[in-house]
Amino acid sequence: MAARWAQFLLFSLLSLPQVYCEYGMVHVLSEKGSSKGKDYCILFNSQWAHLPHDLGKASLLQLQDQTASVLCSPSDVPDGGFNNRIPMVMRGNCTFYEKVRLAQINGARGLLIVSRERLVPPGGNRSQYEEIDIPVALLSYSDMLDIVKSFGRSVKGAMYAPNEPVLDYNMVIIFVMAVGTVAIGGYWAGSRDVKERYMKHKRDDGAEKHEDETVDVTPIMICVFVVMCCSMLVLLYFFYDHLVYVIIGIFCLAASIGLYSCLSPFVRRFPLGKCRIPDNNLPYFHKRPQVRILLLAVFCISVSVVWGVFRNEDQWAWVLQDALGIAFCLYMLKTIRLPTFKGCTLLLLVLFVYDVFFVFITPFLTKTGESIMVEVAAGPSDSATHEKLPMVLKVPRLNSSPLALCDRPFSLLGFGDILVPGLLVAYCHRFDIQVQSSRVYFVACTIAYGIGLLVTFVALALMQMGQPALLYLVPCTLITSFSVALWRKELAMFWTGSGFAKDLPQPPLVIASVNCPQLPKDSNVPASQQETEEMANPTLHVKELHSPTLAAEEPADNDTKTEQSEVSIAQSEEAAGHNKDDLESKSLNLEQKQLE
């Protein structure tokens, strides 16, 4: 139960949009001109001031080493100020705004803040951005030491932000991962739904124990979910440094469960490790699970722990994060079930409004002028932990660029942009199977999701800023699903989910006929009377089948007559039962073949 609530809490954070850090370069060379220049990575915020894209257009200015101070008070300013120079000062003790304001007042043309910790974008509020007109950037402490070692203390530098390709090749990888996860998860959810009904009909309890329970989402649950989204987002906004580790821990737990759920069907097919552990009284282990299942559980937990320990290793940790994220999304898609298109529409539209409000409306409500959503997704600039929320697929940029010197800029896609439309795709596949529509809803909705994602990438290229993907995915998937149902004249059934049955459809009841031999007709008795007697006394036919002489002895053998009648009726019911089972089996086999 605790794990279920943890997953629900994590799901409430999945629609957070992501932002991109702004990387630039500082080109450093000796004032004497005796050595070749060298580029170093910097992290800046273009809201303070823009940097030129071409090195030839950047001003080459003297770098003044002031790393002995933090530039938080006028006493930290040297005599003569920073006239037309770029001071290098240490990070800490005051805000970025206080540092850059002192530098600008004293004639600086830019500011480099040296950080011993991980680089974060230097942030401020809207009024502070309007007041400052010189660029400010963060430089790592190791790069500062390399500058002093390579060029001495008399150096010049030029800050610039080289252009990058509008779209990177990594977008193809993100597209394949996202669409593939939605398609596989939706298909799996529909197939699993049919299998559950099949197992329930057969009353095969042993087989059902291996399956995870599904959760049918109701309108009340959707309302609770939205309230949790809003509450958790506001709590993260005010208590980010404390709650971010809780979210990371929940992600590790949920991702390990998702990975186990995805791999267990394959592990159960292996012929090895079927033996069970000995009898014991330990919790869970008293059920004597198979050795191979225990090994799988240990493996899944180990993968999550490894990611949790090395999550900030940009060279390879993103591969583990993507694998765990895809497994988690597949698990959620096959576990959470929306029973009606009405519920799907409600969920998608509510989250659509949720995104719009927290991205575009909250900047007018906060003191800093920043949206709550962006502030939480990017991590507050004054965060002491500098941790990032992990609910994203991330792929490093693949195009060659001078910015490859930096900490590998990533392209990101939130799990919510996969799960929320994916629940609609899963509903479409289950509806396809129920109405036997050759998966037209499933295919159309999956294609619509892919088109919506492509539109998101185009908007990203045109606006050169991170996009809330649900802004494009929700209209594409909802309109497409609605149009298909309208075209097939199944809108009422699709809207209410009335095509679904709690159990498998029952075949029509067929009563087997009882073959009775005809009595020899008496010419002296009217035909209508003979037919009436035959219908009223079918047992007589059974008796005459055994011996013609029994007809004359009928009054003396009433007990035998009753006995024979019961046998005849029992045989009739048995034949009808066999026919019913045959029809049910044919119906089940038809659904299984349709899935295959």
Swiss-Prot record:
Positions bearing carbohydrate: 93
InterPro entries, per the entry: PA_dom_sf (IPR046450), PA_domain (IPR003137), Peptidase_A22B_SPP (IPR007369), Preselin/SPP (IPR006639)
Signal sequence segment: 1-21
Pfam family, one: PA
Single GO cellular component term: lysosomal membrane
Region (Disordered): 543-596
GO biological processes: membrane protein ectodomain proteolysis; membrane protein intracellular domain proteolysis; membrane protein proteolysis; regulation of immune response
Entry superkingdom: Eukaryota
Membrane topology (UniProt): Multi-pass membrane protein
EC numbers for this chain: 3.4.23.-
Major place of residence: membrane
Function statement: Intramembrane-cleaving aspartic protease (I-CLiP) that cleaves type II membrane signal peptides in the hydrophobic plane of the membrane.
Domain notes: The PAL motif is required for normal active site conformation. The catalytic domains embedded in the membrane are in the opposite orientation to that of the presenilin protein family; therefore, it is predicted to cleave type II-oriented substrate peptides like the prototypic protease SPP.
Family statement: Belongs to the peptidase A22B family.
Record-given protein name: Signal peptide peptidase-like 2B
Organism this protein belongs to: Gallus gallus
Gene from which the chain derives: SPPL2B
